């Protein structure tokens, strides 16, 4: 088992990574919390697979357990479902000393974390991510939120978990498309800060190669995410590097109303398009885009889109990195090295090119 400490002063916590970790989560939580009751927030798909198992694991450690399942999918990440979860916590008569556990991918993780931050002005919460995207990205860093009609993650908070438990065995039930979806974020980490991780992806040729290296990919990704979170907990500076590919990716998601493309697929297209254009503009080392696209295609991830750039740009202007008439783009200089580039919003068309 590997352990990564996220050093945030009084908000510090540990991320544990290891196969079979789920079976010992009850004992670990007993050491980390004084809770008598634990609410498990998950979705209906994960509940069917792991609901009874997590209930028995936590009951075996002496906790009173309630499993709260929301409908699977991004459409559930809204204020109505958020309110339903809060009412369920109140109905379970939870006190401020009790705890919430998210057993899920990103949607219940984000929504459940925001519920933990909000219920009685904050109760302890822990994360057990069940998708590769959640294991390497959304479960690390304390961003919790729900979507509004106007856009993704517009209502939320920074609220760190008390612990994260990553069990790669939980990925065995994940459809291949969603494994690759999550790995887009791992490729991103390679592009912005870990050249060796990127080269590891270049060396992977088969499904067996990927399975053999998945723990290393998870660990290196978590270390990269942790580094940026420790430097910039509240996302005002270097942590924005983690948004490589996301300005275009989020625009694609908004354009298609969060259907058609997964988050990781949108990010893959965003990285590919921005890298190609920044290479043409002289910001990115020659050849990087070809290498990036080769890795993305190996993972069956898209690298282009048949939508005119002028239709994506209005959606890109909703990006959280926009400040007034300026937007910050994350530009890869070379494999493993990126920087933030401030671009006037009227010049965004020079950077978002889909042809």
Question: What are the residue ranges of the model-derived segments?
Answer:
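ATP/NTP phosphate-donor binding region
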Residues: 1-99
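C-terminal charged capping/lid subdomain of soluble metabolic enzymes
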Residues: 2, 184-186, 283-355
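Solvent-exposed alpha-helices and their adjacent loops that cap or buttress functional pockets
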Residues: 7, 93-95, 118-119, 147-148, ...
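A glycine/threonine-rich phosphate-anchoring loop and its flanking beta-alpha core
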Residues: 16, 114-206
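Residue-level signal for inorganic ion chemistry
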Residues: 18, 40, 78, 129, ...
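Non-catalytic interfacial helical region
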Residues: 86-100, 112-127
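Short glycine/serine/threonine-rich phosphate/pyrophosphate-binding segments
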Residues: 107-114, 135, 251
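Active-site segments that bind and position negatively charged phosphate/pyrophosphate groups
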Residues: 199-310
């Amino acid at each position: 088992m590997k352990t990564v400490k996220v050093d945030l002063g009084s908000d510090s916590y540990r991320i544990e990574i290891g196969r079979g970790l789920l079976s010992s989560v009850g004992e670990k939580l007993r050491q980390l919390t004084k809770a008598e009751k634990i609410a498990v927030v998950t979705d209906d798909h994960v509940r069917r697979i792991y609901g009874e198992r997590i209930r028995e694991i936590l009951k075996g450690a002496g906790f009173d357990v309630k499993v709260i399942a929301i409908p699977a999918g991004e459409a559930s990440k809204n204020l109505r479902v958020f309110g339903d979860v809060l009412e369920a916590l109140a109905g379970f008569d939870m006190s401020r000393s009790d705890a919430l556990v998210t057993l899920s991918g990103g949607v219940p993780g984000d929504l459940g974390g925001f519920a933990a931050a909000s219920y009685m002005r904050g109760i302890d919460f822990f994360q057990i991510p069940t998708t590769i995207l959640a294991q390497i990205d959304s479960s690390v860093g304390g961003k919790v939120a729900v979507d509004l009609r106007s856009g993704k993650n517009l209502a939320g908070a920074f609220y760190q978990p008390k612990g994260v438990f990553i069990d790669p065995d939980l990925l065995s039930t994940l459809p291949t498309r969603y494994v690759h979806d999550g790995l887009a974020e791992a490729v991103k980490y390679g592009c912005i800060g870990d050249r060796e991780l990127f080269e590891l992806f270049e060396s992977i040729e088969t499904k067996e190669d990927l399975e053999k290296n998945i723990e290393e990919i998870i660990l290196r990704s978590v270390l990269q995410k942790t580094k940026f979170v420790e430097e910039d907990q509240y996302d005002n500076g270097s942590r924005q590097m983690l948004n490589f590919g996301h300005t275009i990716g989020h625009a694609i998601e908004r354009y298609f109303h969060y259907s058609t493309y997964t988050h990781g697929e949108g990010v893959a297209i965003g990285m590919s398009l921005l890298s190609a254009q920044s290479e043409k503009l002289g910001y990115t080392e020659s050849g990087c885009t070809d290498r990036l696209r080769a890795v993305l295609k190996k993972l069956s991830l898209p690298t282009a889109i048949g939508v005119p750039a002028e239709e994506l740009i209005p959606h890109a202007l909703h990006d959280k990195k926009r400040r007034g008439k300026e937007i910050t783009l994350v530009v890869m200089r070379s494999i493993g090295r990126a920087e933030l580039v401030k671009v006037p919003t009227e010049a965004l068309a020079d950077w978002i090119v889909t042809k």
